[in-house]
Swiss-Prot record:
It comes from the Archaea. Keywords: DNA-binding, Repeat, Transcription, Transcription regulation. This is TATA-box-binding protein. Belongs to the TBP family. The gene is tbp. General factor that plays a role in the activation of archaeal genes transcribed by RNA polymerase. Binds specifically to the TATA box promoter element which lies close to the position of transcription initiation. GO terms for biological process: DNA-templated transcription initiation. Sequence repeats lie at residues 10-86, 101-177. Gene3D superfamilies: TATA-Binding Protein. InterPro entries: TBP, TBP_archaea, TBP_CS, TBP_dom_sf. One of its GO terms (molecular function) is DNA-binding transcription factor activity. It comes from Pyrobaculum islandicum (strain DSM 4184 / JCM 9189 / GEO3).
Length: 199
């Protein structure tokens, strides 16, 4: 990859976990000091882990939603920690429940300005209405993600199901925009900008 190519960072992974058993949330709430449970306001029990920093919404049906992971490894570790916590406090949940990533959100930078007016004319499944939203919305078919592209070169990727999908989508987008001639890469512009900030 040439210098000034795209970069990205995963902001959030949302996954569902099927524990396969019904849970007594009242009993768990009594036993787990860090649990938040107010069934009048929300039907699920909320647990927040600090390492990795993840929130889990646990429902009576045995379904669990995990949010906040920054990578798939953190997600796996969090699910293991949650399963251990639930088992240690009387819930007979399986050691290795079914985990399914529902959505990965990543932010990124193409390190080049984008001519959105031209890009929307050349990309299939793209929409750009600057009066309503400053970014171009591009529905990529493979991998199946939605990219928000801003004139500054900043991007947001949503809908990915794996970290590999994010990496593939970001690089593919960069290559497409470059091939279409709508990316404006300033050679050496970054160094000049840094020097100006220091003054």
């Amino acid at each position: 990859m040439e210098s000034g190519g795209p970069t990205y960072r995963i902001e959030n992974i949302v996954a569902t976990v099927n524990l396969g058993v019904e849970l007594d949330l009242e009993k768990l709430a009594e036993r787990l000091a860090m649990a938040e449970y107010n069934p009048d306001q929300f039907p699920g029990l909320i647990l927040r882990l600090t390492k990795p920093r993840i929130s889990a919404l646990i429902f009576r049906t045995g379904k669990m939603v995990c949010t906040g992971a920054k990578n798939e490894e953190d997600l796996k570790n969090a699910v293991r920690a949650l399963v251990k916590l639930l088992r240690d406090h009387g819930a007979e949940v399986p050691f290795d429940p079914e985990v399914q990533v529902q959505n990965i959100v990543a932010s990124g930078n193409l390190h080049a300005e984008v001519d959105l007016e031209q890009a929307v004319l050349m990309l299939e499944n793209a929409m750009y209405e600057p009066e309503q939203f400053p970014g171009l919305i591009y529905r990529m078919s493979s991998p199946r993600v939605v990219m928000l592209i801003f004139g500054s070169g900043k991007i947001v990727c949503t809908g990915a199901k794996s970290e590999r999908d994010v990496a593939t989508a970001v690089q593919k987008l960069y290559n497409q925009l470059k091939d279409l001639g709508v990316l404006y890469i300033e050679e050496g512009g970054g160094e000049e900008e840094e020097e100006l900030e220091e003054l």
